Amino acid sequence: MASPGHILIVCVCLLSMASAEAPQEPDPFTYDYHTLRIGGLTIAGILFILGILIILSKRCRCKFNQQQRTGEPDEEEGTFRSSIRRLSTRRR
């Protein structure tokens, strides 16, 4: 029969092999900050260049900078809205 010392050694060996073979699960709170930083800088660069292209293309025009359409009737002289329009057109 096996002595208690041999059984103890076999149990210790089995426990050490069982703990060594257990797959290590990745820690869900460990983040790759380098990749996150590079991705953020890339997106920021693309949006910056897109903004510059939109500004330089002159297709984005402000509504109040456009001339009044010729088909619209002139508004009355005494209304509040017409006085605001007259004041805004004097700045040009």
Swiss-Prot record:
Question: Where are its TM segments located?
Answer: 36-56
Positions with an attached lipid (S-palmitoyl cysteine) read C60, C62
| Annotated positions of the Phosphoserine modification | S82, S83, S88
Q: Which residues lie on this side of the membrane: Extracellular?
A: 21-35
Post-translational modification remark: Major plasma membrane substrate for cAMP-dependent protein kinase (PKA) and protein kinase C (PKC) in several different tissues. Phosphorylated in response to insulin and adrenergic stimulation. Phosphorylation at Ser-88 stimulates sodium/potassium-transporting ATPase activity while the unphosphorylated form inhibits sodium/potassium-transporting ATPase activity. Phosphorylation increases tetramerization, decreases binding to ATP1A1 and reduces inhibition of ATP1A1 activity. Phosphorylation at Ser-83 leads to greatly reduced interaction with ATP1A1, ATP1A2 and ATP1A3.
| First and last residue of the signal peptide | 1-20
Q: What cellular component GO annotations does this protein have? A: apical plasma membrane; caveola; intercalated disc; sarcolemma; sodium:potassium-exchanging ATPase complex; T-tubule
Domain annotation text?
The cytoplasmic domain is sufficient to regulate sodium/potassium-transporting ATPase activity.
Give the family, as the similarity comment puts it. Belongs to the FXYD family.
Q: Which protein, by its recorded name, is this? A: Phospholemman
- Species of the source: Rattus norvegicus (Rat)
Name of encoding gene? Fxyd1
